[in-house]
Amino acid sequence: MGALFVAGSGAGFYAWQIEPEWVEFVRRPLVIRGLPQLLAGCSLVQISDIHIGPDVANSYLIRSFKRIAAEQPDIVVFTGDFLTLRSDGRPPIDQMKVVLRHFPQGKLATIGILGNHDYGIRWKEDRVATTVVKLAEDAGLKMIRNQSCQVNGLQIVGFDDLLGPNFGGPQVLKNIDLHEPTLVLCHNPDALDFPIWNGYNGWILSGHTHGGQCKAPFLRPPIVPVHNKRYIAGEIPLADGRRVYVNRALGQSMRVRFNVRPEVTLFQLASDLAGTPSPSVAEVSSKSILIG
């Protein structure tokens, strides 16, 4: 019994104190049809779900941001969920100001979208989202909400969150020239199953799931906050040619992780002028870093 208690205590300590800050830096290619040669070989870093608030230490996020900045990324994208509300239901504004001051900047662009938590209680508080956008923009992010922006010939489209009151739906891509090289940011991957894509068949970068945060080895996580349980983590191909990459999140909404480490994704952009297939998960390489 004593050995079982020690083993259980050790596993609990690991899941509570070690793995939530044991960041995996995943390096992989991102092949975009028609990507301008000017951007070929450039780096694009995806950060997601930092959840500034009671469950993620400021010091951990700041150290992680400094490590990302040391990579000198060309483009940084953030795919939603800046915060977790405090126990009194208010956004952690002072914490956000401290942490976002260190948010890594891309040499060409730093772009963000909102997640469901950025809309406050029950994902319905527009005033919270407005505050989050202001703080993010003050920190150097260009926030896109059912809009697109151009980065050296690459069109980056950002959806507002699926669960929030301002989800753009089919109108977003109807107003976009999909013949241009395009990358879509969409916090909740469940949006992939909605009839809103207007023939788009490129890459989507998502977050939201945290990879489930906890799972037994070789098994799926028991709890994932999406309807479509395919959308857990990593690269998922869709039948119509779209591909989504679901980031496992840098933070968490409850401080526990087991066998699902936090993630920062470092993509190297490449052009698909010849229509060659996108690379598979087998081509992914990663570097593990304990931020401590």
What is the meaning of each model-derived region?
Residues 122-141, 147-148, 152-196, 257:
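Binuclear metal-dependent hydrolase catalytic cores centered on His/Asp/Glu-rich metal-binding motifs
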Residues 48-52, 80-82, 116-118, 147, ...:
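Active-site metal-binding loops of divalent metal-dependent hydrolases
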Residues 189-265, 273-274:
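Conserved beta-sheet core of the metallophosphoesterase superfamily
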Residues 13, 17-26, 238-292:
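Acidic, His/Gly-rich catalytic cores of divalent-metal-dependent hydrolytic chemistry
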Residues 28-57, 173-185:
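Mobile, glycine- and charge-enriched loop segments
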Residues 32-45, 141, 148-157, 177-179, ...:
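Beta-strand-turn-beta hairpins that frame and shape the catalytic cleft
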Residues 1-38:
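N-terminal membrane-anchoring alpha-helices
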Residues 38-142:
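Membrane-embedded segments
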